Curated annotation (Swiss-Prot):
Specific inhibitor of store-operated non-voltage-gated calcium channels. Decreases store-operated Ca2+ entry and cytosolic calcium concentration in a dose-dependent manner in U87 cells. Exhibits anti-tumoral activity by inhibiting proliferation of human U87 glioblastoma cells (IC(50)=300 ug/mL). Also exhibits anti-tumoral activity towards human glioblastoma U251 cells, but with lower activity (IC(50) estimated to be more than 500 ug/mL). Signal peptide: none annotated. GO terms for molecular function: calcium channel regulator activity; toxin activity. This is Tetrascorpin-1. Keywords: Calcium channel impairing toxin, Ion channel impairing toxin, Secreted, Toxin. Negative results: has no effect on proliferation of the breast cancer cell line MDA-MB231, colon adenocarcinoma cell line LS174, and liver cancer cell line HepG2. Does not induce mortality in mice up to 3.5 ug doses. It is found in: Secreted. It comes from the Eukaryota. It comes from Androctonus australis (Sahara scorpion). Expressed by venom gland. The keyword Ligase does not apply. GO terms for cellular component: extracellular region.
């Protein structure tokens, strides 16, 4: 999970 990254930048969303």
């Amino acid at each position: 999970i990254w930048k969303s």
